[in-house]
Amino acid sequence: DSMDKIDGILRGLPFIEASCNSASFIYNGHTRQSFTDINGKRFMGCIDFIDEHYVPILGLQILQGRNVHQDGEVLVNEELLRQVGWTDSPIGRKLMEDNYEWGTVVGVVKDYVAQSAYQPQASVALVNSLERRWEANKRNLILKEPFKENLSRIRALMKETFPTEDIQFRSARQEVDNLYQ
């Protein structure tokens, strides 16, 4: 797959420390999505489509189970467990929206700020879905130092490699700081 090749190239660049994929950025709060609790009642939460590198690179803590490895595997946060009503282990359970199955839960991540510390904790599902992940096609890159020089290098490389595409780079630190200004 061409996207996997691009990822392999990015991860092999000497000025990139790490790379992961997702459909949105963690500081944007993910996409709003409804889920169904154990009584069949809908509630709103957040969803993101990630790869297996996302959780370790972004420093999310797995409290139970393991990280995603295969398509259709899901990580949920503590708040989603509470909202769904699962009081025993969620590992192996199906995350649902009415009759639609998002995937099988393989782990629980510690709650984290998914948009703003000024908002209540969101229910979050992180789904390993290759198809959905490529729809938005976001890359989270951690550059090695010196950051400015390496940012210039990756911008030049992308412009040369994809001359017809408008590939943009943003600093996660600046985006988070903007949330609190």
Question: Whereabouts are the PLM-identified features?
Answer:
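Structured, solvent-exposed hinge/loop segments at the ends of secondary-structure elements
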Residues: 1-84, 88, 98-102
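A glycine-biased structural micro-motif
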Residues: 91-92
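"Rare, low-scoring activations can occur
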Residues: 2-20, 71, 78-79, 97-181
